[in-house]
Amino acid sequence: MLRVPPVIVNFKAYSEAVGENALRLARVAAEVSEETGVEVGICPPHVDLRDVVREVGDEVTVLAQAVDAAEPGGRTGHVTPEMVVEAGADGTLLNHSERRMLLEDLKDVCRACINEGLLTIVCASDALAARAAGALSPHAVAVEPPELIGTGTPVSKADPEVVERSVEVVKEVSEETAVLCGAGITDGSDVRAAVELGADGVLVASGVVLADDPKEALLDLISGLE
Amino acid sequence: MLRVPPVIVNFKAYSEAVGENALRLARVAAEVSEETGVEVGICPPHVDLRDVVREVGDEVTVLAQAVDAAEPGGRTGHVTPEMVVEAGADGTLLNHSERRMLLEDLKDVCRACINEGLLTIVCASDALAARAAGALSPHAVAVEPPELIGTGTPVSKADPEVVERSVEVVKEVSEETAVLCGAGITDGSDVRAAVELGADGVLVASGVVLADDPKEALLDLISGLE
Amino acid sequence: MLRVPPVIVNFKAYSEAVGENALRLARVAAEVSEETGVEVGICPPHVDLRDVVREVGDEVTVLAQAVDAAEPGGRTGHVTPEMVVEAGADGTLLNHSERRMLLEDLKDVCRACINEGLLTIVCASDALAARAAGALSPHAVAVEPPELIGTGTPVSKADPEVVERSVEVVKEVSEETAVLCGAGITDGSDVRAAVELGADGVLVASGVVLADDPKEALLDLISGLE
Amino acid sequence: MLRVPPVIVNFKAYSEAVGENALRLARVAAEVSEETGVEVGICPPHVDLRDVVREVGDEVTVLAQAVDAAEPGGRTGHVTPEMVVEAGADGTLLNHSERRMLLEDLKDVCRACINEGLLTIVCASDALAARAAGALSPHAVAVEPPELIGTGTPVSKADPEVVERSVEVVKEVSEETAVLCGAGITDGSDVRAAVELGADGVLVASGVVLADDPKEALLDLISGLE
């Protein structure tokens, strides 16, 4: 069965996480995972997906940052669920606040990804969006209030209610779906707060990618899981 | 409380339903509603919304065809929930297959419309989309497989399972939400089939708007409700 | 021939410019136009377009805020070029920064509007976008750097080069196309600066719509044309 | 200076052109280029871009299928101009009919790609769109009437006027910009017809990707250049 890692690092389009930097960051994730025994997920850019899978695919959960609602065939510039599978990745994020989807496309691609055996994590901005996303029965919903993304002000402390409420409403519509939270998560105490609110894990980006020492930052985050 | 009319006629952008034609069609709906005692809903184009409300606003349920996820203020070319209220309309369609929305925008505008007291009907292409739409707790979800829209092949006969399944999954996530079905509905037997499958009503367009005799067409549809 | 008014007021979705307020503001524009002999353009919300045309259609140039790339027929929630004509309006804005269009849709709708005899004004964010918009040969291109919209810092003073350069490049690709500028325009001196840079007029919104005395504000703007 | 290859093969999302198949097709292109001395361009999927560059980057022109209007940083699921450069690719398609862009985004990304030294080819559906695309001064505009894509009915024979007219209007606004044509191109005679109409080359996809013998298909296409 597909497990949702309790810490997922979204590389976004940061220069610090493209090409050689993507591989370096991927190895950091693999080291930390091995040292701590905690499953770590990473989301490299599309162009680095294959290389990252080759480098650390056996050690961490590798996710695409997005997949398009497109079947194989005459589609230009799209990343299909089949391409992600073929590249050897384990899953994908969908509907990130920087890549919102039409409800109908999200529904199609969510179903296609689940059918392809991909770990499917749908992002949502608040509890009501999380409820709708949860109704598609993905493996996880990641609640990220866009106004907190990249701020260093953690959702789990700044807006605990959105986390608690999201856990509650997602379970109402899809009991098996995990709930992650994200936005502003930077250290272990933010993670601990998230878990205490009922979240199954966290989705982070700049807190690790832009950290002076990404390994230390990731270890610190994971310390909050204990 | 807001009631969902069992028959709603979407005027779309048909020349037969713009301007004077919109008013004529609106009066037909009002006559039929009075003669049969059945509540009828109509969805005129944005530019005709006010005139139609003035003409028949006391006799039928007047709905906008769409509303944008926009608050009053510096937004150009948008129709806000507040404008629809101010125009005196009763509600709106959202996410029609010809006007799909981002999940996040749909969530925002659905919440805003409900808060404004507007009858809020969210369209969906299949049962899974209906479940996600239902999770937003609108007054109704209208299931319309796009491939049947405008064909004259009624969803309630061509794909009964999508109707049954939609009723089932919408109730799972929002018991109070009504379920309509649409696409290809043209006569009373199509409506009867829909109701027997558990639908609370139908959403029609070309079947009435393009009929030789729209009044007769509408009366025929309503005969299927008995 | 269609003339481009040297001052066009975009009502946007401001509560101050919807319903009765739209009519009041429209009458202000008509009065000012009559008193000064200067043609004024106004862009009411879709739902007020017909009423505004009825009220002042003979006295001012009434423009839709946007038109969709849609032909009459099975299109829901769209405003077609034909609807704008049928409502009696004179033209439309297209591609406003709050309602950006796909290049291909813009091309289709621009051509359709021109063919329908509508005064067609395409917005653009900078000189390069103005050049591409101009290549479609609309009646006017309105250059509005989005970062200055609604700020009260006039483009004609804060970024004179974008105005001059836009005039130059639009003429390169379409000699007949007028060039307006907008964003932050609030008084006559801003208009004068625009005209001195080669602009044929201005596109304003909050500077008039939100003014304590819209008539005075509009008169002041027009004083800059002399 | 960047040269526009006279034959460019878009791999799209065909299963026949992903992963190992992408590499195989890339080697075919390299062989044909070497044997004929004609520069060939290929557009692999995002996830295969790096591997294809490693395999044949010195022998053929490798282009991304699309680039997003995004700068490095907090952007999820996007392919930035910088990523394409970093992956070692030579350029990109933009605005393909299966991946249309907002005019404003196209303008931003077109400028960014040119600034990054990427060979920038903007697709357009007809002569008017080609004129607007040309106004952005990309290295090439590729005219592809969407209704002919994938049909095997070549634009250069079915609609010669759109090719001639596109060449004419693109040169009006940007003399240095090359004009390619595409849609339905399958053999050398289609290419010859295109060149006789003034086109600088062709953009093909299924005609090569889905051919029983892609090498033979590509050689046949190139024979039309003589």
Curated annotation (Swiss-Prot), chains A, B, C, D:
UniProt xrefs under InterPro entries: Aldolase_TIM, TIM_sf, Triosephosphate_isomerase, Triosephosphate_isomerase_arc, Triosephosphate_isomerase_AS
A Pfam family assignment: TIM
Catalytic activity: D-glyceraldehyde 3-phosphate = dihydroxyacetone phosphate
Chief localization: cytoplasm
GO MF term set: triose-phosphate isomerase activity
Keywords: Cytoplasm, Gluconeogenesis, Glycolysis, Isomerase
Compartments, record wording: Cytoplasm
Gene Ontology cellular-component annotations: cytosol
Pathway stated in the Swiss-Prot or TrEMBL entry: Carbohydrate biosynthesis; gluconeogenesis; Carbohydrate degradation; glycolysis; D-glyceraldehyde 3-phosphate from glycerone phosphate: step 1/1
Signal peptide start-end: none
GO biological process: gluconeogenesis; glyceraldehyde-3-phosphate biosynthetic process; glycerol catabolic process; glycolytic process
List of residues binding substrate: N10, F11, K12, I149, G184, A205, S206
Active site residues of this protein: H96, E144
Enzyme Commission designation: 5.3.1.1
Family in the record: Belongs to the triosephosphate isomerase family.
HAMAP family (UniProt xref): TIM_A
NCBIfam families: PRK04302.1, tim
Function recorded in the entry: Involved in the gluconeogenesis. Catalyzes stereospecifically the conversion of dihydroxyacetone phosphate (DHAP) to D-glyceraldehyde-3-phosphate (G3P).
Assembly mode: Homotetramer; dimer of dimers.
Protein name as annotated: Triosephosphate isomerase
Organism: Methanopyrus kandleri (strain AV19 / DSM 6324 / JCM 9639 / NBRC 100938)
